[in-house]
Amino acid sequence: LSTETLDGLDWRPVTVARIPDHAASPQMCELNAKVSRHHPVSVHRAGDDSFIYDMGRNFVGQTDVVMPVVEDGKKIALYYEDYYLKDYADFRDGEYSDYYVGNGKSGGVFSSKFNYKGYRYLKIKGLEAPLALESITLSPVMTDFEGGADFECSDEDLNAIYNMSHETLASLVLGGYMVDCPQIERLGYGGDGNASTPVLQTLFNVSPLYMNWIQAWADCQRENGDMPHTAPNPYSAGGGPFWCAFMIAASWQTWLNYGDERLMERYYPNMCRWLDYAESKCVD
């Protein structure tokens, strides 16, 4: 910045913004935790300096890569994918990426500690030789709640469906609420919550998590009673009335599953405010 460059900008009059009142509440549920450790099961060359590592299945978590000595200033790219069609040709480089920059003196460890990833395939681009499988570790991350139910029968297809549902839901519950997807938006959509709550609350003891999630909905309720489609609500997201009504349906379901009526007692006024708002927008 300099006087010359600032004078050349197109300055406009100041706009006064009105900031609505918002509550700031603590996270009242278990923290995230790394629950296990996994290494890739195979590696394949995908170009002169690219290698794709297969984790064997999709995971959501922290990735740690032990890097060799890399030329000073050279950038090593890490790309993530949950699937590809064939021959690695449709691997979406740059869609979801991290970068490691070498110092030319010693190796280092890349860690996605502050940005978990959801993927099965990891492409590392910029190295002349593949890393040992043990150099790459994926540690699944989930909210550290307790299990609530198990299922097993003589039908292997039903067992597979149960295991898929169990692992999917566990992978989606991060940071005190359930996300729509762990690799893109990571938003707590009310529509997704309504569809998943009966199963999620049956498989796991997530009563504290729902106390936290419903609190987030109350925190971001607007002054006129309107509700967003996601909570927490960092930016606008799509949905409809079914999304906004999550506070009502989830509180009721929490009482049915756990006998815990605190959500209905605590947030009944918020529910009434939203219903009044919704009714004000209805015609006939």
What is each residue range found by the language model?
Residues 86-95, 207-284:
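Helix-terminus loop motifs that line ligand-binding clefts
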Residues 182-188, 237-240:
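A glycine-rich, coil/turn loop motif that links secondary-structure elements
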Residues 111, 154, 185, 199, ...:
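Generic anion/oxyanion-binding catalytic loop in active/binding sites
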Residues 73-82, 148, 190-215, 268-280:
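Carboxylate/His-rich catalytic cores and anion/metal-binding grooves
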Residues 1-182, 191, 208-209, 228-233, ...:
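Extracellular/oxidizing-compartment recognition motifs
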